[in-house]
Structures are given as C-alpha cells and as structure tokens.
C-alpha cells in the first residue's frame, strides 16, 4: 500500500530560475555570431547587438573563434551556461568577455522584472497530467520510467517587441534554456508550456540509444541512396531530432502531448493540409515549417507505438522522410 501511494504521489516538476551569468553567456554567444545555422535568429541578434560598440568587435571575434575551434562547440556553451569553468577554453572566454558585462547590463535591466514574472508563472505550472504520458514516451525510447525527472530552466532575456518563446536543450546538460515572450496572456503561457515540453522531449531523445539506432538505419535506408539534402540550415541529425520532438510537443502541429497541454485533440493531416497548400502556393515554406509538416505525417504511427508500448524503430520516420522527399521534388 505504501509503495502504491508513493507511485501515485511521485510526479515531476520543471523549476524556472534566473541566473544572470547564464543569461550573459547566452547573450555573448548570440552577438558573437559564431553560429548562423537554423538556431540563429536575426531579430534577436539585432536586439542583443544594439549595445555593442565598435571597440567590442575584437572580443566578439575572439569568442567566436574559440567556440568554432572546438569539435563540440555546444559543450563549451553548456559549461559556460552551467558555470563550469573547468577547461581552458571556457575560462578564456569568461576572462576575455569580462569587459562586455557592462554592455549586457542594459539588456538585463530591460528584462529583469519581466523574467521575475515569468519565473513565477512557470513555477505555478503543474505536470501531474503529463507524468504518465512522459513515462510512456520514455519506454518508447527504450529508457526506464525513472528517466522522467525534475528539470531546471534558465530564463533568458526576450526581445521587447512581439516575439515567440524559444528553447534550447544542449546534449549532456541538466538544464533547459528558455527565452519567454515579453508579453503575458493565456495564449503566451500555453505557448511557453509547449516549448518547455518540446525541450524536455529533446532531453529524453538525447538519452536514447534506440533513437540513435533508428535514425541511423532510416538515414542509411532512405536518405543516402537518394542523396537527399537536408532542409536549409539543418543537418540530417538535427532534422531527425526535431521530427521526433515536434511529434511529442509542437506549437504548430500539437504533438502527442497536445491534449494534455491544450485540452484539444491533435490536429490531423487533413486539418492542416489546406493551410500548408496555401503556404506552398504563396512561397517556399521555411525549413521549420517543412519539418513540422513532415512530423505531422509520422504522428499517427508514433501515437500507436507509444500507446501499444512498442519501441522506436526506423519505420517511425518513413512517413516524414517521404514528405521531405516529395517537397524536394516539387
């Protein structure tokens, strides 16, 4: 009986916190412009960069060079964000960037009160209705149910203008980075919660050896023979990661957790077909839109796998890769 009560009581939580050092190093890597892939957001760069003076460019160039020189640049960022200055490169970046802290202070002052409010809002969220679904996802990925653990979120400075929430989950990190929107309403709160669970899903995916095996087999079977090119700004590794994470939680297609996150059923392909076809008629969709649309096509199979307790395999990705291939031909 006691064990049953413990199982019922055991839940998970995501705790938001504010850390100026984490926010500073996120701002620093953005204005250094070391990465211009899909992760780069020009409007955010413009806002963050407004406080930079010409004399600062040498420091930014040095920071960019150090990050780019590492075989695993995101590991350097993980250490900087987490306050782990245990290697030469992270210590060097921390040292040479010290003069820029005063520049960052004006950005920090703009958003500090806003982040305080978002921290309280996020820490009021409950995840009791998601716990069992997340455990099912863990099993699907070949993980133990105990993989569903509490997580820490570091809040990052948002743009002052209208913007959408964005998150990051670096592999091997024990935290999530979240940049909330500046404004508040129920719709924004829902969007933030979805982004948080999307990034939480990335954390589970990063732990899954079965995901790596399924993605590799799918890549060797469906991508290599046709020499398919990944959507602009993405590698195929990142595409496979995003396909699965969007299937779990997405502001665009809902995902497996949509009923718990929004109280609404997941949109179907037919529900979204007309809007996507209109988009195609106007212009070429962005890489993010392509991946979301492709992900929607694998959602029914993923849902069946999860509900039936099946393990992830390469077949999960077939519907999505087929869509990407068809869009390439069109």
Predicted regions located by residue number:
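Active-site recognition of the HExxH zinc-binding catalytic motif
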Residues: 190-211
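Active-site scaffold of zinc-dependent metalloenzymes
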Residues: 78-79, 152-155, 159-190
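Pan-zinc metallopeptidase signature
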Residues: 249-253, 257-330
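N-terminal low-structure segments adjacent to metalloprotease catalytic domains
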Residues: 1-106
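Post-HEXXH active-site segment of zinc metalloproteases
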Residues: 207-237
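Auxiliary, metal-adjacent structural segments of Zn-dependent hydrolase domains
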Residues: 110-171
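Soluble non-cytosolic domains of exported or imported proteins
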Residues: 124-131, 187, 191, 195, ...
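An active-site-proximal "capping" alpha-helix that borders the catalytic cofactor pocket
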Residues: 137-140, 239-254
């Amino acid at each position: 009986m006691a064990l049953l009560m413990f199982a019922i009581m055991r839940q998970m939580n995501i705790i938001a916190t504010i850390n100026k050092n984490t926010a500073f190093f996120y701002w620093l890597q953005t204005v250094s412009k070391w990465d211009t892939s899909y992760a780069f957001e020009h409007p955010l760069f413009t806002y963050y960069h407004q406080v930079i003076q010409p004399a600062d460019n040498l420091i930014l160039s040095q920071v960019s060079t150090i990050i780019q020189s590492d075989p695993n640049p995101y590991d350097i960022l993980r250490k900087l964000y987490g306050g782990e200055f245990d290697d030469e490169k992270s210590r060097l970046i921390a040292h040479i960037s010290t003069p820029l802290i005063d520049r960052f202070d004006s950005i920090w002052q703009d958003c500090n009160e806003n982040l305080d409010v978002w921290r309280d809002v996020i820490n009021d969220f409950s995840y009791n209705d998601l716990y069992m679904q997340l455990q099912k996802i863990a099993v699907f990925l070949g993980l133990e149910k105990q993989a569903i653990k509490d997580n820490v979120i570091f809040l990052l400075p948002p743009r002052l203008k209208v913007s959408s929430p964005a998150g990051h989950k670096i592999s091997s990190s024990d935290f999530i980075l979240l940049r909330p929107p500046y404004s508040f309403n129920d719709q924004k709160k829902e969007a933030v919660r979805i982004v948080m669970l999307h990034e939480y899903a990335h954390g589970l995916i990063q732990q899954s050896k079965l995901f790596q095996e399924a993605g590799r087999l799918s890549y060797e079977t469906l991508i290599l023979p046709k020499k398919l090119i990944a959507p602009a700004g993405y590698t195929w590794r990142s595409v496979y990661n995003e396909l699965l994470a969007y299937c779990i939680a997405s502001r665009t297609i809902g995902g497996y957790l949509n009923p718990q996150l929004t109280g609404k059923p997941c949109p179907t392909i037919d529900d979204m077909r007309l809007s996507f076809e209109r988009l195609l008629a106007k212009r070429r969709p962005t890489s993010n839109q392509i991946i979301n649309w492709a992900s929607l096509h694998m959602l029914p199979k993923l849902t069946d796998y999860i509900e039936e307790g099946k393990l992830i395999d390469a077949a999960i990705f077939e519907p999505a890769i087929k869509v990407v291939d068809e869009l390439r031909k069109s």
